[in-house]
């Protein structure tokens, strides 16, 4: 079974080689990404119990949920630069162990202030993880195969949403009161420890770069290095940016930064508040809330894979991304419109999540065709750093609106408008983000 479609490659030899690499690294990175997303958004479920225990208002929760991204943004670029210096294996392992410890420590939150501090520190600890993973894939897979690789990883968001909702609801409902701990405290403990354990595994399992890895033959190592070096030269000759100064002057890159910002506003604005949105649709147990919260992520995951495969097969990025963002915009607007009609609201949330997740994995395949060398890592980190400000702004905005008006749907309309702007910007991006030549076609 191929993780990356046969139609993506020029030859059966390339297909076999790069799928062998994909099977080696993608399933493991997928697990890491699932754990990362669970640790990032489980606070949305914890709120259903901890708000009363800790004294969190809707605005305080929104601020605390979003302040994670301030820490994340401040340390994003330094973290990615350190990864290039010390190597992916050591740095990703460090990230996971530290964030797992801090995530577990969330069980000791007792006041809004301690909630803010630990959420900020969690962002600092996790800074560099996703752009580091994206950068790591550029070391192993050619650009024309990266969208499907990113789709496999981004599927971790959907999978985490599918299992995270029911799991979180079950933990909070089942363990509440056990050994004197509240259900939300057990949630942070049981979902934080896996990151620490996996961080240790990372150090022994991942290899920094191709060239001398034991699970490839000498000829295969040499071919991967040659393919990726040739691709780098082709991008440089075609005008891909190499220097840091040029990266910051690249207009298309700043367009991608804005698009990523808008997408993250929508995704995290919904993800952090999804349990509350679902809860408002009718009376449910915590487990039922978790099960219903899983539905949009399940639908989004399927759509993301289909769009990612089609984008790689046609080697087109811009329109796949812009139309997906437009679908997210429509879903957000409809979910606000039908907030009193459970089935229609849930269907609209499915459309919003399908559009967001589909756009993400296509969007993140573009920077590698615009940038090369040191500019690649910094460009990716720039997209994530500025984009993740949306992860701070949207949960706080949703909390402020909820506390001021008593309605979350006004916030959903604002997120829909922002996604509409992003779809229009993405449609105007002119770069190599359209069709890209396959590695191996060059003489």
Task: Kindly give the residue locations of the regions a language model identified.
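Extracytoplasmic gate region of multi-pass secondary transporters
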Residues: 43-44, 245-304, 360, 364, ...
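Helix-breaking motifs and short loop linkers at transmembrane-helix boundaries and internal kinks
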Residues: 55, 87, 108-114, 125, ...
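Conserved MFS/SLC helix-loop-helix module at the cytosolic interface between two early adjacent transmembrane helices
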Residues: 74-113
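Helix-to-loop junctions at the C-terminal end of transmembrane segments
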Residues: 75-87, 303-316
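Cytoplasmic membrane-interface "Motif A"-like loop-to-helix N-cap segments
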Residues: 84-96, 312-325
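Cytoplasmic helix-loop-helix junction between adjacent transmembrane helices
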Residues: 118-155
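Glycine-rich segments within core transmembrane alpha-helices of 12-TM secondary carriers
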Residues: 150-172, 194-195, 384-394
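C-terminal transmembrane helical hairpin of 12-TM major facilitator-type secondary transporters
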Residues: 317-366
């Amino acid at each position: 079974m191929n993780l990356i479609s046969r139609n993506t490659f020029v030859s059966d030899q390339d297909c076999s080689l790069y799928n062998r690499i994909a099977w080696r690294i993608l399933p493991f990175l997928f697990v890491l990404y699932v754990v990362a997303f669970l640790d990032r958004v489980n606070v949305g479920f914890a709120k259903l119990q901890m708000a009363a225990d800790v004294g969190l208002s809707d605005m305080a929760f929104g601020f605390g949920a979003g302040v994670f991204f301030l820490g994340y943004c401040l340390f994003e670029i330094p973290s990615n630069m350190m990864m290039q210096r010390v190597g992916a294996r050591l740095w990703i392992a460090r990230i996971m162990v530290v964030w797992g410890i801090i995530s577990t420590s969330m069980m000791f939150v007792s006041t809004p202030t301690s909630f803010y501090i630990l959420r900020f520190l969690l962002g600092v600890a996790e800074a560099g993880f996703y752009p580091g993973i994206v950068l790591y894939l550029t070391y192993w897979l050619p650009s024309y195969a990266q969208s499907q690789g990113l789709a496999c990883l981004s599927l971790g968001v959907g999978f985490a949403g599918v299992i995270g909702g029911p799991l979180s609801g079950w933990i909070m409902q089942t363990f509440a009161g056990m050994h004197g701990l509240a259900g939300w405290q057990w949630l942070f403990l049981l979902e934080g420890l896996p990151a620490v354990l996996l961080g240790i595994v990372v150090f022994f399992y991942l290899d920094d770069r191709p060239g001398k890895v034991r699970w490839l033959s000498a000829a295969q190592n040499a071919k991967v290095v040659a393919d990726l070096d040739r691709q780098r030269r082709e991008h440089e000759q075609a005008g891909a940016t190499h220097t840091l100064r040029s990266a910051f002057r690249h207009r298309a890159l700043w367009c991608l930064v804005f698009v990523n910002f808008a997408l993250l506003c929508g995704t995290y604005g919904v993800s952090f508040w999804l349990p509350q949105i679902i809860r408002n649709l009718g009376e449910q147990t915590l487990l039922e809330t978790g099960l219903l919260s899983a539905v949009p992520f399940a639908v989004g995951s399927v759509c993301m894979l289909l769009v990612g495969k089609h984008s790689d097969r046609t080697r087109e990025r811009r329109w796949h991304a812009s139309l997906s963002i437009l679908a997210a915009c429509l879903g957000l607007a409809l979910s606000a419109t039908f907030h009193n009609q459970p089935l229609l609201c849930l269907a609209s949330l499915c459309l919003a999540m399908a559009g967001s997740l589909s756009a993400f994995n296509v969007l993140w395949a573009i920077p590698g065709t615009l940038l090369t060398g040191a500019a690649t890592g910094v460009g990716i980190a720039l997209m994530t750093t500025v984009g993740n400000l949306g992860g701070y702004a949207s949960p706080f905005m949703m909390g402020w609106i909820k506390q001021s008006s008593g309605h979350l749907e006004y916030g959903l309309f604002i997120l829909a408008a922002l996604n509409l702007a992003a779809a229009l910007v993405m449609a105007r991006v002119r770069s190599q983000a359209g069709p890209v030549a396959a590695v191996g076609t060059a003489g």
